[in-house]
Design a protein with these regions (language model features):
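Short acidic loop-to-helix transition motifs that present clustered carboxylates
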Residues: 110-113, 135-139, 197, 237, ...
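Solvent-exposed, charged interface segments at domain starts and junctions
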Residues: 89, 129, 133, 137-144, ...
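Proteins enriched for Cys/Gly/acidic motifs involved in redox and nucleic-acid/cofactor modification
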Residues: 22-23, 49-50, 118, 133-160, ...
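Short, charged/polar low-complexity linear motifs in solvent-exposed/disordered segments
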Residues: 58-60, 147, 187-188
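Enzymes that bind and transform nitrogen-containing heteroaromatic metabolites
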Residues: 2-27, 42, 65-68, 86, ...
Length: 316
């Protein structure tokens, strides 16, 4: 592996992040085409059902540079697909273009790929390097990797608590509310418990941020009248909940409450990231905030106009 390989792979990762909102449920992927130390094309997967990163990178190459592809290296953050889905196989495209070399960040865990794209390139005589910035490329698509590797959705927990540790009150400010809606737009589904649904009658949609609204689910072991666009999960068992969401093809779920449901997820260990907003006011409420598990690893703290938002990852 060359130092220059890492430089261009970092650019692939940077490009891939542009697909956060619209690429899902597909992975975020970036691609860069390099000839003689110069980038002559680049692209990323913009939207599910549209051209993949490799397709867009090839399309960005000017006509006068197309003859250089046979002496070029293409960098891609995820293994090129080898199957027909909504678009043709990218591995076939790279073979047809005659690339000299292909550098791949990480292998695709999707059952239809899993090394087949890499093998197809090698069988065609293309020099293939795999594993450049592998961990960074896997983290880029931790949601996709979790869904296809662990056969469950990527789970994000979120709550806001007062300075004295209660969650039953108005705590968020305008900025942190905007962050909350940004996270909603980044997830395919949103989940609340019965008590939260009956007390707050939440719409659970995305209003103060650009993007789609997640599919709303309510967890209740009791019969419950819900709006037509809501979905009822009639088991409070966390593995059962996640299995149902997996069968519904939900790759990412945001759990917003209430305290009982959040604590159940935390205690089960079946969560991936957690955002805790800490307010500055004392409200002397009646519902205590969930307690973080020993597996919760603090990775960042953001100060937002008097509020503190801490991000934790499950290190288990």
């Amino acid at each position: 592996m060359l130092i220059t390989d890492e430089i261009y792979m970092k650019r692939c990762i940077q490009l891939a992040r542009n697909g956060m909102m619209n690429a899902q449920p597909n992975p975020m992927v970036g691609a860069v085409i390099v000839h003689d130390g110069k980038i002559i094309g680049e692209g990323y997967h913009v939207c599910c059902g549209k051209g993949h990163a490799e397709v867009n990178a090839c399309a960005s190459v000017s006509k006068e540079n197309e003859n250089l592809l046979k002496e070029s290296t293409i960098y891609v953050s995820l293994e090129p697909c080898s199957h027909y889905g909504k678009t043709p196989p990218c591995a076939d495209l790279l073979v047809s273009k005659g690339f000299k070399r292909c550098v791949i960040g990480c292998q695709d865990p999707f059952a239809e790929v899993q090394g087949r794209g890499i093998q197809k390139l090698r069988d065609a005589g293309i020099e293939v390097t795999v594993g450049v910035l592998e961990e960074e490329c896997k983290r880029l698509n931790n949601r996709f990797m979790t869904y296809h590797g662990k056969h469950r959705p990527f789970v994000t927990l979120k709550w806001a608590e007062s300075a004295d540790g209660y969650i039953d009150g108005h705590i968020s400010n305008a900025y942190t509310q905007m962050l909350c809606h940004k996270r909603r737009a980044e997830h395919q589904a949103i989940l609340v418990g019965r008590h939260t649904f009956e007390k707050d009658h939440p719409s659970l949609n995305t209003r103060v941020w650009y993007g789609h609204s997640p599919k709303p689910y309510v967890v209740s072991s009791h019969s419950l009248e819900i709006p037509g666009n809501f979905n009822l999960l009639n088991s409070e068992d966390i593995p059962c909940i996640l299995n149902k969401l997996y069968k519904d093809s939900i790759q990412t779920v945001l759990v917003e409450g209430g305290a009982k449901l959040l604590q159940s997820f935390m205690d089960s260990g079946l969560w991936d990231e957690c955002y805790v907003e800490k307010g500055s006011s004392i409200i002397s409420g009646s519902v205590k905030a969930p307690v973080l598990s020993t597996d919760a690893h603090l990775v960042s703290v953001e100060h937002c106009f008097g509020q503190q938002v801490s991000k934790y990852l499950n290190k288990k």
